[in-house]
Regions:
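Short coil turns that delineate tetratricopeptide repeat
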Residues: 42, 76-77
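Start-of-helix register in tetratricopeptide repeats
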Residues: 12, 46, 80-81
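Secretory-pathway glycan-assembly enzymes, especially type II membrane glycosyltransferases
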Residues: 95-306, 310, 314
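A donor-sugar binding/catalytic signature common to diverse glycosyltransferases
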Residues: 121, 365-414
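"A position-specific structural signal for the A-helix of alpha-solenoid helical repeats
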Residues: 16, 50, 83-87
Length: 426
């Protein structure tokens, strides 16, 4: 554990960095770093003041006033800066834009399948917070389109039902204004349009608040954890934990195509009639991202051993993995108890979705089917810092009623971090 003095110094440096970001107009980065300081136990009033300043810039005086109260509680005496923030927060804001013709288009952010779904879930919450009709369109930048698909094909609807009745054709050719201004009627379904680099890149969520344009377009990820702080008090998900927010939004919007549900039920009827533990093992690019996973590998086997008595001693093991060496390891250890789907596997350090020789549509179907089947098992062991494991966990709780005793996630959660580094433009 870091010594207290070193931790305080680190937090002061983070607040200084966030203050500089705010001075450049990068208020979402500033707010995100301030949240990280507070999540680590930092007690700097300046962190709360940065949050208040951000809230005022996106027309959320309710959030600003709450942050100001926290800042004042940490100060020994009143500060002029805090008083100035309070005066601004108490100034009546201009009316919020209203009307039925307000849309939020959610593009792919061109990462892994469940990372893209994670992105969609967050932006669906943004649509609810901002009162916009959502439309998910995974266009030419999606890694999960069929190789033969061209033009305006929507890969999202290859896997899931539409999240609303709105179609791209209903939005275009009406003279509607767009934000960010890099978007227009003609380029909504194209490949990359500066999601990570260039003007109006790395726009995550807060820039969409209080916009007057009829159409907002998202092509960059915002962690659900960061978004939960901005849920209005009157919203059904206000103050709910991140896991509950995900599962609520999934129940409302995430509807896999009937063909996949039928296939998952058929597989379960054939292979999962006896007690089965689903085990999701990551390798390839996740090993590169997180480093040596050997310690986690040992914890997997401990978790399987702890779950086994609950299911008769020697349950079946459904191995869900993209990592070819894992199959050999599990078969050697557990023998014919192991069930493995036919999903594509690799021994390379490059994720399957980044390997150009593979067909994205097929990979998407495989990883979706793996998750749906795993969620039909009796228990689960996964890597918490993986969207695949995270969504299997949510699906299993919704499908099979798993609780923490039956769904073991190893390590810190991928949905428990703010990932402020994603917003850094330099």
């Amino acid at each position: 554990m870091m010594p207290l003095a070193a931790q305080d110094e680190r937090h002061a440096g983070m607040v200084a960095y966030a203050t500089d970001a705010m001075s450049r107009g990068e208020y979402e980065l500033a707010e995100r770093v301030a949240r990280e300081v507070l999540a680590e136990g930092g007690r700097l009033p300046e962190a709360w003041e940065l949050i208040a300043e951000t809230a005022l810039r996106v027309s959320r005086p309710d959030i600003a006033l709450g942050a100001i109260e926290m800042a004042e509680a940490l100060r020994a005496s009143p500060a002029p800066a805090t008083a100035a923030l309070r005066a601004r927060a108490l100034t009546p804001p201009k009316p919020s834009p209203a009307g039925n013709d307000r849309y939020h288009i959610i593009r792919s952010w061109a990462q892994g399948f469940w990372s893209d779904v994670d992105h969609v879930m967050g932006q669906l919450l943004v649509a609810e917070i901002t009162g916009r009709k959502p439309l998910v369109h995974w266009g030419a930048n999606s890694r999960f389109r069929d190789a033969t698909e061209t033009g305006d094909a929507n890969a999202w609807e290859s896997f899931f039902e539409p999240v609303s009745s709105v179609k791209i054709a209903e939005i275009t050719d009406r003279g509607l204004a767009y934000f960010p201004p890099k978007w227009n009627d003609a380029n909504l379904t194209i490949g990359d349009n500066g999601a990570f680099h260039g003007p109006h890149s790395r726009i995550a969520a807060l820039d969409f608040f209080a916009r007057e344009e009829a159409v907002t377009v998202s092509d960059f990820h915002a962690p659900m954890l960061a978004l939960t702080h901005w849920i209005p008090r009157e919203h059904r998900l206000h103050s709910k934990p991140v896991s509950r927010v995900f599962m609520d939004l999934m129940q409302k919007y995430l509807k896999p195509k009937r063909e996949f549900l039928t296939r998952a039920d058929t597989f379960a009827g054939k292979h999962l009639s006896k007690p089965t533990i689903a085990v999701h093992v990551r390798g390839s690019d996740k090993a590169k991202e997180l480093g040596d996973l050997s310690a986690a590998a040992a914890l997997y086997h401990q978790a399987i051993a702890s779950l086994s008595p609950l299911m008769g001693g020697k349950p079946k093991i459904l191995l869900v993995t993209d990592w070819a060496p894992a199959e050999a390891e599990y078969r050697a250890r557990y023998g014919d108890r192991v069930i493995v789907s036919g999903a594509t596997k690799t021994s390379l350090s490059t994720g399957l979705h980044f390997q150009p020789s593979l067909i994205g549509r097929n990979l998407g179907e495989e990883v979706l089917m793996d998750a749906l089947i795993a969620a039909r098992c009796h228990a689960f062991v996964g890597l918490a810092y993986s969207n695949v494991s995270a969504f299997i966990g949510y699906l299993g709780r919704l499908t099979k009623g798993w609780d923490d005793s039956r769904a073991i996630q190893i390590g810190p959660s991928i949905h428990g971090v703010y990932n402020s580094f994603l917003l850094k433009r330099s």
